[in-house]
């Protein structure tokens, strides 16, 4: 096959630009204008009338439309080839009916509803996989288009791209910040994305590599190619897509911690290893151009490093223990050493200078001789011509030492510093010997990678729940009454034990030994992989000072302390997750830092206290508005409390993929932060689809790092901005409280709501998924309280309710208007980025929600519980009305036409999967959830809908 245009067969295909062959009904447009804040807005759900041919593509997105069209034709050919003409015809039937239904064709609605019923499980699975394949490919095409648009921007203008490095540097200079101040500001920045596994479906590593290769070929397509060259690229794309069709989306066996680790390491090694040097070069070049200084004269410190939770997150994951931590570091070191090894080999081929033609430093010459003596017989085995090529010879020596390190043999490197010193010798020799344009650039790139990744690749945080730590303290301290003691009493007893260095009174049980073994591993890890290898020990579910002190005491029981200072050599960070913990976080830290035993610990740990704030639990507990305000206020309280002690602090945002769990662009986190809470540290947990969206391609990863730099540097420059006006805070407090009451009234007001949730969503399928190593429920909880936030959000996302992302906001806005007045609320929205970002996120969730599709799931609900669906629909109507009023808009996302268009184009392709999911759920449950074929079709539907919505949780 050549280019798509040469293919034979029907021209109708999966692409979101063609007008459907449907019967259209005339529709009117809602021309609302000038309404008051409480006037009723006619509800037009997202499933309602959207004339597809009316959706406009701006000229700058024409290339994306062409790509999607061509890829759609290709997928159609693959479906015919792999599944046969009947499968293709059914896909087309569903697709056309779904589009016509969206345009108001009642007959099409009935036909689609009838056609999805009672399909054999294997057929339903293939149909869902067909739509899923299209979405996966379109998602990739959209990412490729982002890369092309970025390149086109730089080709067409000299102006810095908004949100980029140059834009930040230009803004700093325009506000009068001198070069020295800019360099000092940058030197104080710390950007650390922390990658975590997802408890729900993630793209398999095999498919990630295939997607990378498809993206590379799409990026190479262009008008400058011959027909033969273009044809070869399209054949390569077809190969990857066809083999992807023949590959299982979801493994039949449960993913291990090792499987999850490989997905994260893919992005670190394949993407970020390549991107990091270019990121620093962009900063240097921007400073050089804007401040008119030589870029090479700018010496930037290391401001970007990476972390991971995969292999160290013990919370609700019994498969993580000391062995998995050791295995994780061993694997990470294997990969980074191999990357260095291959780079040294490539550089050895390129740096071919002869000693007769290039000046080589004495130090480098001496080091070569030293290494010759380290390896007996090396000189005899070295070709004479290579001896006269010192850089090549030395780089091959470095590669050999790296291999010895990899294999654990003698004469390997003890640590990354030794390796860096060797590479630095090459840089110094090149600089002194007129080699600035003969290899110095590439050597400096290697040095930057060593500074970033060391011999450990990424720091590993280890996390355990506070309740587990207290169970060990109770058992080891022979204190059965420990769980019933007050937090204050436990704090006093723990502080006393730390001051006396008291060990366990009885032999620990299996749980205690298992956890102490983790602490004991830390010293081994640091010795072997470097001081930055171990990140934080995170205490999840923290509610008081005693939770942190419990971790500190267990570390002492495991002898994780410096023999000289007698202090624990581990950074311990509480994770505040519940609404109450967030609201009390400042007081908790105040009490913790008042304990002399803990102050001694902090003073031995560079006077820095880490804290994590979680978005998920508080959202599940109180809804989006109350959760976000609590997080905002917690940042203020933590910054003030820790700052008042003179200690430094690092606040890490533990967020998920959806806005319900704190997802969204990195810069929004900083722009929404309270004045004074930003201190130069940006540590964000990245999880699930956000990793692929932000770091899936090298140019996208570069853009993600640039956005982080832009937002963090400008926030630091403006950190002395005025505090938020009290009037704005009062509006937000009223909004949050009223929304919380509405949310809790629905979710926790009647015990039957749990049964409604289990009936109306595919939570029972999610609970049985064999895809993640973590559990779906907390060990100590039951019912809704015990359900982890990830499956909670994922279940509502699947049904298109998107309930955790918006429910209660309408009640909150209405209450704020009633109490403070419409003009005051609008003023707060216009002037305060936090409130504006919150409302914009709620608007996006409302736009992604589809209450008409969601209503299809009501057939799964017993008649006596369907009133919950009516309550949800009424609150959706109210929230939509209030958001449109506050934004002075006619339709949701009028201010973001790109996202609005994407949702409207995608919806018809998601709808058939939802309707099939409803039918499959009904049949599976009717058979006592025993039919394996139906279950596998349901698993495919979960993946397909998630691909279409680009959201899990």
Regions found by a protein language model. Name each.
Residues 45-494, 509-514, 570, 663, ...:
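Often metal-dependent polyanion-binding catalytic scaffolds in large enzymes
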Residues 757-953:
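C-terminal accessory/interaction regions of large nucleic acid-associated machines
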Residues 76, 635-643, 873, 877-883:
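Hydrophobic cores of alpha-helical transmembrane segments in multi-pass integral membrane proteins
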């Amino acid at each position: 096959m050549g280019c798509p245009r040469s293919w034979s067969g029907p021209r109708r295909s999966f692409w979101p630009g063609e007008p459907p062959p449907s019967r259209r009904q005339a529709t009117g447009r809602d021309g609302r204008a000038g309404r008051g804040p409480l006037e009723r807005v006619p509800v037009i759900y997202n499933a309602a009338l959207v004339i597809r041919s009316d959706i406009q593509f701006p000229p700058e997105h024409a290339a994306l439309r062409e790509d999607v069209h061509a890829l759609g034709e290709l997928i159609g050919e693959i479906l015919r080839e792999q599944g046969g003409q009947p499968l293709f015809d059914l896909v087309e039937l569903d697709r056309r009916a779904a589009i016509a239904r969206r345009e108001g064709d009642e007959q099409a609605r009935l036909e689609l509803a009838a056609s999805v019923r009672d399909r054999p499980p294997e057929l339903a699975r293939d149909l869902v996989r067909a739509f899923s394949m299209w979405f996966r490919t379109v998602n990739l095409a959209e990412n490729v288009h982002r890369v092309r648009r970025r390149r086109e921007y730089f080709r067409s203008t000299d102006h810095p791209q908004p949100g980029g490095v140059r834009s930040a540097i230009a803004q700093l200079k325009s506000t009068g910040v001198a070069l020295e101040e800019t360099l000092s500001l940058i030197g104080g920045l710390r950007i650390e994305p922390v990658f975590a596994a997802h408890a729900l479906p993630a793209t398999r590593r095999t498919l990630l590599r295939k997607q990378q290769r498809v993206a590379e070929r799409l990026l190479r397509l262009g008008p400058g190619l011959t027909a033969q060259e273009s044809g070869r690229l399209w054949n390569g794309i077809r190969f990857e897509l066809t083999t992807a069709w023949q590959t299982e989306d979801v493994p039949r066996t449960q993913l291990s911690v090792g499987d999850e680790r490989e997905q994260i390491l893919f992005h670190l090694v394949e993407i970020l290893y390549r991107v990091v040097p270019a990121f620093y070069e962009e900063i240097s070049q921007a400073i050089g151009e804007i401040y008119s200084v030589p870029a090479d004269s700018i010496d930037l410190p290391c401001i970007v490093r990476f972390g991971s939770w995969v292999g160290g997150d013990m919370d609700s994951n019994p498969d993580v223990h000391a062995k998995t931590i050791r295995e994780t570091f061993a694997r990470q070191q294997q990969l980074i050493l191999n990357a260095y090894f291959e780079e040294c080999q490539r550089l050895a081929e390129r740096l071919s200078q002869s000693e007769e033609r290039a000046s080589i430093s004495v130090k480098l010459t001496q080091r070569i001789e030293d290494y010759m003596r380290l390896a007996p017989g090396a000189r005899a085995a070295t070709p004479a011509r290579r001896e006269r090529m010192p850089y090549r010879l030395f780089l091959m020596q470095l590669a050999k030492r790296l291999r010895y390190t990899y294999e654990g043999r003698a004469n390997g490197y003890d640590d990354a510093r030794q390796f860096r010193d060797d590479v630095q010798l090459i840089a110094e020799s090149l600089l002194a010997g007129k080699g600035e344009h003969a290899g110095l650039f590439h050597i400096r790139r290697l040095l930057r990678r060593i500074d970033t990744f060391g011999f450990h690749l990424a720091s590993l945080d280890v996390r355990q729940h506070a309740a587990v730590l207290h169970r060990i303290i109770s058992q080891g301290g022979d204190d059965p009454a420990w769980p019933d003691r007050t937090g204050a009493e436990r704090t006093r007893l723990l502080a006393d034990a730390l001051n006396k260095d008291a060990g366990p009174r009885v032999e620990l049980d299996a749980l205690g030994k298992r956890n102490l073994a983790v602490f004991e591993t830390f010293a081994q890890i640091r010795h072997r992989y470097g001081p930055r290898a171990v990140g934080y020990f995170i205490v999840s579910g923290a509610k008081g000072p005693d939770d942190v002190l419990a971790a500190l005491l267990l570390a002492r029981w495991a002898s994780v302390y410096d023999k000289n200072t007698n202090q624990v050599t581990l950074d311990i960070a509480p994770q505040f997750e519940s609404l109450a913990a967030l609201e009390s976080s400042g007081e908790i830290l105040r009490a913790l830092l008042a304990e002399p035993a803990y102050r001694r610990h902090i003073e031995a740990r560079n006077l820095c206290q880490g804290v994590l704030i979680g978005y998920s639990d508080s959202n599940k507990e109180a809804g989006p508005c109350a959760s976000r305000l609590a997080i905002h206020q917690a940042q203020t309280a933590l910054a003030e409390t820790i700052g008042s002690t003179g200690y430094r602090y690092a606040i890490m945002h533990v967020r998920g993929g959806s806005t319900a769990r704190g997802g969204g662009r990195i810069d929004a986190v900083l722009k929404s932060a309270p004045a004074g809470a930003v201190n130069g540290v940006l540590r964000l947990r990245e999880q699930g689809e956000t990793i692929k969206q932000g770091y899936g391609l090298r140019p996208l990863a570069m853009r993600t790092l640039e956005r982080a730099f832009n937002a963090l540097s400008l926030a630091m420059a403006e950190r002395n901005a005025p505090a938020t006006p009290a009037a704005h805070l009062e509006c937000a407090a009223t909004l949050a409280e009223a929304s919380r009451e509405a949310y809790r009234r629905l979710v926790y007001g009647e015990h039957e709501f749990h049964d409604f949730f289990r009936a109306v969503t595919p939570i029972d399928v999610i609970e049985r998924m064999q895809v993640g190593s973590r559990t779906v429920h907390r060990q100590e909880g039951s019912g809704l309280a015990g359900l982890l936030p990830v499956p909670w959000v994922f279940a509502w996302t699947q049904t298109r309710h998107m309930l955790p992302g918006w429910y209660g906001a309408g009640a909150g806005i209405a209450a704020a208007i009633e109490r403070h007045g419409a003009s005051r609320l609008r003023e707060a929205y216009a002037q305060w980025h936090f409130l504006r970002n919150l409302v914009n996120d709620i608007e996006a969730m409302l736009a992604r929600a589809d209450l008409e599709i969601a209503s299809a799931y009501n057939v799964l609900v017993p008649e006596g519980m369907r009133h919950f669906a009516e309550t949800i629909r009424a609150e959706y109507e109210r929230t939509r009305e209030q958001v449109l009023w506050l934004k002075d808009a006619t339709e949701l996302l009028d201010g973001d036409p790109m996202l609005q268009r994407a949702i409207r184009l995608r919806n018809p392709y998601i709808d058939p999967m939802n309707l099939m999911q409803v039918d499959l759920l009904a049949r599976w449950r009717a058979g006592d959830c025993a039919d394996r074929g139906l279950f596998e079709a349901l698993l495919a539907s979960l993946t397909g809908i998630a691909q279409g919505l680009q959201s899990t949780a």
